[in-house]
Amino acid sequence: MPEVKVPELAESITEGTIAEWLKNVGDSVEKGEAILELETDKVNVEVVSEEAGVLSEQLASEGDTVEVGQAIAVIGEGSGNASKENSNDNTPQQNEETNNKKEETTNKSADNAEVNQTNDYNQQRVNATPSARRYARENGVNLAEVSPKTNDVVRKEDIDKKQQAPASTQTTQQAPAKEEKKYNQYPTKPVIREKMSRRKKTAAKKLLEVSNNTAMLTTFNEVDMTNVMELRKRKKEQFMKDHDGTKLGFMSFFTKASVAALKKYPEVNAEIDGDDMITKQYYDIGVAVSTDDGLLVPFVRDCDKKNFAEIEAEIANLAVKAREKKLGLDDMVNGSFTITNGGIFGSMMSTPIINGNQAAILGMHSIITRPIAIDQDTIENRPMMYIALSYDHRIIDGKEAVGFLKTIKELIENPEDLLLES
């Protein structure tokens, strides 16, 4: 019988964790239909069946780690059970069998069965994250009765809000809250022990690898944001009118400045592969996005060929996809340089950690008004931002790193030059 195997995902991804089975044993499966959701280091992907038939066996359970090429399910012949989405579209024979079964049971049993079937149907058709589905099952919550806060996608916090509502507003019985586990080393102190998500474990592993396998160093500079802020203020309304509502932000300026600096200092756009150094001739800039599952870095492709509006629109689109868990692998791999903005969280200064397979990362920070000496006789309050470049000293010398950051500073302080180049 045909097997479903973990597909090839990306060169850097060799395994994943089964987040949720979308089909149960005995369910009918169409060719190309998703049967499970797989959580990888970067994104969640749906694994589809290459054959039509019946899911006759699940070779791994939710939470199991599976490798690329590993068999995870068996598809048998036959029509199987109707899927949950089509549970109401019964054939005449199925309807007759259902009627016969109802006659053999009490009205109460039939009513309970019907309610359970409806709940199962509602659980399946509601748009929810995999973790929210598991959380709802564990706590006996009907997802159909949970109101999502954003983007029509039910998340764990929406379920918590539902459970915390007054008892009079509840329509289903809630399962008792889980007892907090106690860490044995401190038996008298309350702690919570929980498994890290696959993505969190992978991030921790990669961050440690970067620290251990690179000669990482950080250099700093400061940028006077006066001119770019004034330019943005003058142009933003007309910019939105000219570009279908796309907002002019600071990220496009820093992205364009980074491309110019990368062209001037190509070592910053390189990586080490064994005994070779690979200098990239393309400019795919990663933009760090904070999500409920941690920090994700999708890439804006070919930034040297895009104008300000195209870059801003792409950044906004990738941010939405990241927060709605809709990023694909193509969005997450093979970048050349990364920009992270700790300023949105209030960070004044930091040393960002290099993204995998890259030589450097640019860190933006909060804009803070402070007194600056304009000349020997003049001090003015100016909106200032500290910028940081963490880099692999094996590839990039200090001279190039300082020069790169100085180029960023000069371009941001003279933003008209960036607009002319674009």
From Swiss-Prot:
The keyword Protease does not apply. Residues 1-76 form the Lipoyl-binding domain. CDD domains: lipoyl_domain (cd06849). Its EC number is 2.3.1.61. It catalyses: N(6)-[(R)-dihydrolipoyl]-L-lysyl-[protein] + succinyl-CoA = N(6)-[(R)-S(8)-succinyldihydrolipoyl]-L-lysyl-[protein] + CoA. Pathway: Amino-acid degradation; L-lysine degradation via saccharopine pathway; glutaryl-CoA from L-lysine: step 6/6. Residues 152-163 have a biased composition (Basic and acidic residues). Keywords: Acyltransferase, Lipoyl, Transferase, Tricarboxylic acid cycle. Residues 77-184 are annotated as: Disordered. Its cofactor is (R)-lipoate. E2 component of the 2-oxoglutarate dehydrogenase (OGDH) complex which catalyzes the second step in the conversion of 2-oxoglutarate to succinyl-CoA and CO(2). This is Dihydrolipoyllysine-residue succinyltransferase component of 2-oxoglutarate dehydrogenase complex. It comes from Staphylococcus aureus (strain bovine RF122 / ET3-1). The gene is odhB.
